[in-house]
Regions:
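A detector for small-residue-rich transmembrane helices and their helix-helix packing motifs
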Residues: 1-203
């Protein structure tokens, strides 16, 4: 894979910063509009099941910029920053943004295959793709679980993937799009493999 490292390492690189800002603005705008009864933004931008009659192709992109509540937004954005700034510095902004969007859209596509859900919102699928990238790029790096227990990134990522699979299969933690999370990781994994085989690709 072609590797890129900027001369100056940034703790808040361009794409990560802009994604944080956009997600916050969309969340606040949605909250204000819904308070006054304007539900159209949610109906049109959240990811709806294909058979619902509400599905629109652009929802595969827009759903990842919407969040159910502040806690949902906070943890997604914290994880995006925590792992994303490292990956963006390592890959460069253009490749990072392309990867992020592919993982988010891929997560949405996988979720469309799962029956029995209403709407899906959130950047979690894309963020899980970023987590997967961190584990593949820096497998021996130690992550402090709950800020206390050190665990290598590769085991951290594998553990999360197993948990998501088990929760998805057993129906644990209903209301969480486990297969979307897995979809983001799968699409990220395939894209990284492609880049490794084609190191001089455009992205």
């Amino acid at each position: 894979m072609a590797q890129y490292s900027p001369q100056r390492f940034s703790m808040l690189p361009t794409v990560v910063k802009n994604l944080l800002i956009i997600n916050l603005i969309v969340f606040l705008a949605t909250m204000v509009l819904e308070k006054y009864g304007f539900l159209l933004i949610t109906n049109m931008c959240a990811l709806n099941p294909i058979g619902s009659g509400r599905f629109r192709i652009w929802q595969l992109l827009t759903y990842m910029f919407m969040h159910a509540n502040f806690e949902h937004l906070f943890f997604n954005m914290f994880a995006l920053w925590m792992f994303g700034y490292v990956i963006e510095n390592f890959w460069g902004s253009r490749r990072f943004l392309f990867y992020y969007l592919v993982c988010g859209v891929g997560a949405g596509l996988c979720n469309l295959l799962v029956p029995g859900w209403d709407i899906t919102v959130g950047a979690s699928g894309a963020v899980y793709g970023i987590l997967l990238a961190f584990g593949m790029m820096f497998p021996e790096e130690r992550i402090y679980l709950y800020f206390l227990v050190p665990i290598k990134a590769k085991w951290f990522v594998i553990g999360y993937a197993v948990i998501e699979l088990l929760c998805g299969v057993t129906g644990t933690a209903a209301g969480v799009a486990h297969f979307a999370h897995l979809g983001g990781m799968i699409f990220g994994f395939l894209l990284i493999l492609y880049w490794r085989k084609h190191p001089f690709s455009k992205f």
